Amino acid sequence: MKRILLWVVIVLVLIVAVLFGNLMLFERAAERVSEGVPIASFAAGKSALLVIDIQEGTTGKLALKESYIKASDSLIRLVNRLVDSASERNVPVIYVRSEVSNVLVNLINNSMSTGSEGAALDKRLKVVSDFYIPKQNAFSNPILDSILIANQVNKLYITGLDAGFCVNSTIEAALNRGYAITVISNAVISETDSLKVQVFERLKAKGVTFLNSGEFPASVN
């Protein structure tokens, strides 16, 4: 009997180890910055607005992180105004969503699994296009490259969350491809203000520009 119990414990420990090991590998892959192909030099380059990870499972009714929940109303109001401004100027709006298809990761937490309510866009978010990019990080999905090239985009305006994670990896991947990046600073949130400040300072040193949401209409083309 003791031997059976011992084997049960060993098997359970191995299962837990495999699950959490898989989760760590998944998170590491999600944070990896893709290289991509440098963009073409478009004669009349255009802009696009990226809305990153504003979803039911991050800012909506299924959200778990208190910092995101507290910031969500203000964030979504700002982003919706930016979406309106972009639409008025025929600037493409692209919605980037995190979703998890890894079966083992979903055994631990399936709140953002593919097709789940948590993976859907936050219902408060204004949707004006059918440009949806499911991803672990935005440029990990080649659809984003295709949309930007088809629309001759060479400048990206960034909104959403989290400054220290998906927003950061998306910006880094965009820089690798030669895009000009402008972060709309008051329309990006993070788990902590200190993390946001730290990431923004590092990105400034790489040539990323920052502006307030009120400056967006005058700057966009």
Model region roles, listed by residue range:
Residues K2-V127:
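Active-site acidic carboxylates
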Residues K46, E117-Y132, D193-N221:
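Structural recognition of alpha->loop->beta junctions
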Residues E56-G57, E99-V103, A138-F139, D162-F165, ...:
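Solvent-exposed loop/turn segments at secondary-structure junctions
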Residues N90-V91, Q152, G178:
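Glycine-centered short loops/turns at secondary-structure junctions
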Residues G115-L161:
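Internal catalytic-core helix/loop-beta-alpha segment
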Residues Y157-L161, Y179-D193:
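A short glycine-rich beta-strand->turn/loop micro-motif centered on a GG-aromatic cluster
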Residues V167-L175:
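Short Gly/Thr/Asp-enriched flexible loops that form oxyanion-binding sites at enzyme active sites
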